[in-house]
Regions:
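N-proximal low-complexity "stem/linker" segments adjacent to membrane-targeting elements
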Residues: 1-46
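Membrane-interface aromatic/basic loop that binds lipid-linked glycans or pyrophosphate carriers
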Residues: 1-12, 16-17, 132, 292-351
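A conserved acidic beta->alpha catalytic loop
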Residues: 44, 51, 59-68, 86, ...
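Short aromatic/hydrophobic "clamp" motif used to bind/position activated sugar donors
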Residues: 106
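Acidic helix N-cap motif at the loop->helix transition within catalytic regions
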Residues: 39, 53, 64-72, 84, ...
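Catalytic core of nucleotide-sugar-dependent glycosyltransferases
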Residues: 227-234, 241-268, 283-318
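Donor-binding/catalytic cores of nucleotide-activated saccharide
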Residues: 111-222, 233-242
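Glycine-rich, basic loop-to-helix element that forms the pyrophosphate-binding segment
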Residues: 85-101, 114
């Protein structure tokens, strides 16, 4: 028996593509343990005003009713294909979906979230109007039962269309001025296919690890000021379950990002050193804060590695003549004292 199986209607990719005048968009939806939310997500996709879609539901070995629910959708809409596979995690499911996708453009959706019905239409119109190959949009948040969450805080809010070069967009993303989620943009499939793209399997924070790889291979990025995606706030999400392993995944993700950026755009080397310093200082602070809230122990070896990393980055930034932001310097001074208190007792014990 094959590790993967696929369910679909009899319609072919060529039929979905029509005469080629309207680009085919592949929507990739990893599915695992979301039977409560899956139908609402898929309904938003099949109801898109942009009709030329293939919707890939990748069942990642879900233990609930999701596999049967996915199969049932193929009888309701001929554009839906279902891939059943053994559980491998979000990145693995995305990679499988990407390998199976036949569209001219790629869009990833999380199966517990919801989308506006004009999301693809707005993205594709923007691609055409601005000769772009990557279009980003805003998002808002909904509760577990799908109700809008109102807040005066709007993350990375903007009111006008923003046109960016890849380098401009990368710098904005690294500075957290652009959201680092794969569901926050539609991109040309060639960006993925022509550069050997894949998500890192077996890790969290996979979006940060790879988003700049996509941005960097585009030729024009356009951001539109519309909230087209609805992110569902659920208990037990990654952000609500901090651990030392999650901290390690954050470190690996930002290292992956830096490696790609510096190799692809060497002129950003000094910029990345400063941004890495800012990132690690803030990550450290948040790890210690979360350890107090969640009551988990910080591994002294991890603490020592991060301390040494910050020391090295501090020297690199000073050597380049760059100025550390005042807020980061203040936090850095506090963290140095905290590290000394955490690491020195263990060193003394070994002596």
């Amino acid at each position: 028996m094959s590790a993967e199986s696929e369910t679909s209607s009899n319609v072919t990719a060529e039929a979905m593509n029509g005469d080629g005048a309207t680009p085919l968009v592949s929507v990739i939806v990893p599915v695992y343990g979301v039977e409560r939310y899956l139908d609402a997500c898929v309904e938003g996709l099949v109801g898109q005003t942009y009709r030329n879609l293939e919707i890939l539901l990748v069942d990642d070995g879900s233990p609930d009713r999701c596999p049967a629910m996915c199969d049932a959708w193929t009888a309701r809409d001929e554009r839906i294909r279902v891939i059943h596979k053994a559980n491998g995690g979000l990145s693995d499911a995305r990679n499988v979906g990407l390998a199976k996708a036949t569209g001219d453009y790629i869009y990833f959706v999380d199966s517990d979230d919801m989308v506006e019905r004009n999301l693809i239409e707005r993205a594709m119109a923007t691609m055409r109007d601005y000769d772009a190959d990557l279009v980003m949009f805003q998002f808002d948040t909904i509760s577990e039962d799908g109700k809008p969450l109102t807040s005066s805080y709007k993350h990375n809010h903007y009111d006008d269309v923003i046109i960016m070069t890849p380098i401009e967009a990368i710098k904005a993303q690294v500075k957290a001025e652009i959201d680092g989620y794969f569901w926050s943009f539609v991109a040309a499939a060639s960006i993925y296919r022509n550069h050997g793209f894949s998500f890192p399997v077996g890790r969290k924070i996979e979006d940060m690890a790879r988003i700049c790889n996509v941005i960097g291979e585009s030729h024009r990025v356009v951001r539109i000021p519309e909230a087209l995606y609805h992110y569902r706030m659920r208990r037990g999400s990654i952000t609500g379950d901090w651990s030392m392993q999650l901290t390690r995944d954050w470190v690996r993700a930002t290292d992956d990002r830096e490696t790609y950026i510096v190799e692809r755009f060497p002129e950003l080397k000094n910029f990345m050193k400063l941004q890495q310093l800012i990132f690690f200082v803030n990550l450290d602070y948040e790890t210690i804060r979360q350890s107090l809230v969640a009551k988990f122990s910080i591994d002294p070896q991890d603490a020592d590695r991060i301390r040494r990393r910050i020391e090295g980055l501090t020297k690199d930034v000073a050597g380049a003549g760059d100025e550390v932001p005042e807020s980061t310097q203040s936090l850095l001074d506090t963290m140095k004292q905290t590290f000394a208190e955490m690491v020195e007792p263990d060193v003394g014990a070994e002596a």
